[in-house]
């Protein structure tokens, strides 16, 4: 009986050890499978994060380049506009410097020479030019054209003059601003060639 108990104890031990080994192997296998699943999931998430980060970096670089190009275009346009403005201002100053009293008197008389003798005409000058030219012009003009011509002050004129039929149907602008604008439009294509950056 003693052998039977001993055999029974050995058998229980052996069965317990076998069961423990089986459970242990099963736990280890499950742990390995879970670890592999966790590793695969982590690798997949890492790959997705890497792809997302690379896309964000690419997009950021692309947007930065686009913003840089736009800023450069804006700078070029702004510089071109500033240069045009300076050029136009210099042109206006040059035209204004030519408009002295003698030149204005000659120009007004020549314009009136080609105008119809029967027209009622208003000549508009700035106040300082009226003070300088009024008596000379009135004498020259009235002798040729009679009393149908009036010389009037006009605050909107810096240098130069405007000539208008009294009924308002015909109008010529010989102000320094208008002449500078005409010259600028004529010179603008050449000016663009000079400052062209290509």
UniProtKB/Swiss-Prot annotation:
Disulfide bonds: none annotated. GO terms for biological process: proton motive force-driven plasma membrane ATP synthesis. InterPro entries: ATPase_E_C, ATPase_V1_Esu. One of its GO terms (cellular component) is proton-transporting two-sector ATPase complex, catalytic domain. The keyword Ion transport applies. The keyword ATP-binding does not apply. GO terms for molecular function: ATP binding; proton-transporting ATP synthase activity, rotational mechanism; proton-transporting ATPase activity, rotational mechanism. Keywords: ATP synthesis, Hydrogen ion transport, Ion transport, Transport. NCBIfam families: PRK01558.1 (NF002424). Produces ATP from ADP in the presence of a proton gradient across the membrane. Belongs to the V-ATPase E subunit family. This is V-type proton ATPase subunit E. It comes from Borrelia duttonii (strain Ly). The lineage of its organism: Bacteria, Pseudomonadati, Spirochaetota, Spirochaetia, Spirochaetales. The gene is atpE.
């Amino acid at each position: 009986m003693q052998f039977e108990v001993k055999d029974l104890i050995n058998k229980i031990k052996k069965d317990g050890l076998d069961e423990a080994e089986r459970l242990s192997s099963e736990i280890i296998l499950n742990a390995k499978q879970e670890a592999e699943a966790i590793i695969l999931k982590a690798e997949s998430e890492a790959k997705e994060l890497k792809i997302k980060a690379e896309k964000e970096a690419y997009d950021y670089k692309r947007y930065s380049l686009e913003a840089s190009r736009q800023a450069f275009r804006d700078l070029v346009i702004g510089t071109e506009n500033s240069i045009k403005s300076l050029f136009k201002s210099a042109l206006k100053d040059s035209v204004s410097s030519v408009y002295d009293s003698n030149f204005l008197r000659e120009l007004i008389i020549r314009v009136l020479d080609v105008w119809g003798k029967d027209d009622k005409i208003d000549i508009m000058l700035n106040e300082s030019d009226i003070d300088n030219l009024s008596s000379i012009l009135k004498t020259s003009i009235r002798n040729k054209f009679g009393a149908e011509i009036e010389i009037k002050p006009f605050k909107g004129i810096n240098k130069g003059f405007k000539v208008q039929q009294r009924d308002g149907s015909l109008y010529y602008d010989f102000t320094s601003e208008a002449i500078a604008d005409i010259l600028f439009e004529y010179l603008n294509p050449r000016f663009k060639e000079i400052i062209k950056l290509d």
